């Protein structure tokens, strides 16, 4: 029997508290000595979460990686290109693939990936991103450049995703671990109809 692969929708990039990348907006760097004198636009400094490349490589050994971000493609694509140096992300979904609900905009509806959600997982630092499928979501601690020793990807998420890849249905395991339907209800969002 061959190894089963569990599709995994990993949200990373774009936003103030990203899953895999940290951003800092600021003034442009000082001009080079031979500057043409034209004003420069602001720039964004990107900090990769520690272990990001190893995490993506190891996950790709047992899961199909899909990047699903609420970021606009023109902005997010260059960041994702940088993040995915080994080309392990199979598909990229940007803001036009998100939906608006009565509670939030830019929600990632996993039903666009498959009608059968028993083996689909979304990892996101913003739980509201997966409010339509709370039983498929793994809330991730946000990353910022001020956390150079962050081990969330390799120590916390990788073992959990490996464990989930062995399950016929990830939702009961994720419910036991995170109780996301109750979390959404505490935040005023009903989750009826999203059960296993």
Question: Which residues make up each language-model segment?
Answer:
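Long, acidic (Asp/Glu-rich), low-complexity accessory segments flanking structured domains
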Residues: 1-32, 187-189
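A solvent-exposed, charged loop/short amphipathic helix patch at secondary-structure junctions
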Residues: 32-42, 147-149, 153-154
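Short, acidic loop-to-helix structural element flanking the phosphoryl-transfer center
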Residues: 40-65, 100, 104, 111
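Conserved, ordered domain cores of eukaryotic regulatory proteins
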Residues: 16, 32-34, 51-85
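C-terminal cap/substrate-recognition subdomain and adjoining C-terminal extension
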Residues: 61, 72-196
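Generic detection of intrinsically disordered/low-complexity segments and helix-coil linkers/edges
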Residues: 37, 49, 177-178
């Amino acid at each position: 029997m061959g190894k089963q692969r569990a599709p995994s929708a990993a949200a990373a990039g774009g936003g103030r508290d990203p899953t895999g990348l940290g951003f800092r907006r600021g003034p442009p760097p000082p001009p080079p000595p031979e500057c043409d004198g034209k004003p420069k636009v602001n720039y964004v400094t990107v900090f990769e979460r520690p272990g990001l490349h190893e995490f993506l490589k190891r996950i790709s050994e047992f899961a199909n990686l899909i990047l699903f971000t609420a970021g606009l493609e023109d902005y997010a694509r260059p960041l994702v290109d940088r993040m995915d140096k080994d080309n392990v992300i199979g598909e990229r979904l940007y803001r036009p693939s998100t939906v608006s609900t009565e509670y939030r905009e830019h929600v990632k509806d996993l039903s666009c990936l498959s009608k059968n959600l028993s083996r689909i997982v979304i990892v996101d630092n913003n739980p509201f991103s997966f409010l339509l499928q709370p039983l498929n979501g793994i809330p991730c601690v946000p990353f910022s450049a001020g956390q150079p020793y962050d081990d969330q990807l390799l120590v916390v998420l990788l073992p959990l995703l490996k464990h989930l890849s062995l399950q016929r249905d990830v939702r009961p395991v994720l419910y036991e671990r995170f109780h996301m339907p109750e979390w959404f209800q505490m935040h005023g969002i009903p989750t009826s109809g999203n059960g296993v």
